[in-house]
Amino acid sequence: MKMLTSRKLRLIKRTLLYLQVLLFIGTTVHANDTNEELRGATFTEPTKIFEMDTDWLKKPITYDTSIENADLVITLGQHLYPIAEPIIKKYAKEHGLKIFINEGTCGISAGMLSRKAADIGGYCCPPGETDRLPGLKFHTVGIAALALFVNHSNPLDNVSIEQARQIFSGEISRWSEIKIASGGKGSNKLIQPVARLHCKLRPGHWHLLLANEDLFSSPSLQEVGAIQDMISQISNNPMAIGYETMTSVHRYYPNENESKVKALKLNGYSHNEPSELLNGNYPLYRTLSLTTWEGEDIQNSHATKLVNYLTQQIEQIDSKFGIVPVSQIRKAGWKFYGNELNGEPE
């Protein structure tokens, strides 16, 4: 008897888990509720603070030795950096401040904040339970639609959220299983989903497509670690499908013809229709946040003023960035805990 490879064992595990979820759904909910059972958590409880020891609580903000004479140290995720960096530089010049800006990821932001090595951290996901450090406050600056996109040669222009979940789980395996706008069918070739399963312990983002990584069980699934790799795979593969904010696509490929990708409508709605994202018709999005500290030896008044300034500037930002600002989110009935977005509208 042949030994099963670790990849095959992983695939079997994912498939069994997915079948268990479907079986549970089929016996407990109506058909039109199925999608919500596969959707992951949107936010974490804001009042549940992660415990740290006494030495950590007493520790002041201390910059890394490579950073000299800074008034502020900021670390931003790769989604916020291209938007916020020029605004911060302008603010620093106008106010005579020396501000050190680091481009990283949510994980890098979390690491620097847990070391108390930064005044402000930037996230592209809602905070996970371990991100909620004592004295750390989250300030949402906007949300951005997470687009499903395919190679520009693909004739498909729309999928339902149910079909998207079936594609990434492997239940739909060929493009011919999905009707296109003209009434015909796509290629009979295998769909090749591409997934970037980052920030696994933080809610929102890809968890809104499928709740956990084991549900991404398509046999032809390819995992990538970087946004550029995601875009490159789909640019070069007519059978591929992936997801990301289209702002990220435009950042790495300013010339749309170079990226060779196009966004699909989801449930008939486009990623660039803010009203449909706000009312819940478009169900996939990122939550963009900044942090500040409150408390003795950790609070920096420059940080509070800068975060307020950035929030105001993003209210007026060009629509090409695809960010829906806080004022519109509040007006649409989304829930906030202080300045932190913490719930979708009912």
What are the residue ranges of the model-derived segments?
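Serine/threonine-rich, low-complexity intrinsically disordered segments
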Residues: 7, 17, 29-30
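Exported/periplasmic ABC-transporter solute-binding proteins
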Residues: 30-118, 125-127, 132-142, 149-346
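Bacterial N-terminal signal peptides
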Residues: 15-26
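N-terminal secretory signal peptides that target proteins for export/translocation
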Residues: 1-11
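Short, Φ-rich (hydrophobic/aromatic) sequence segments
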Residues: 4, 21, 306-307
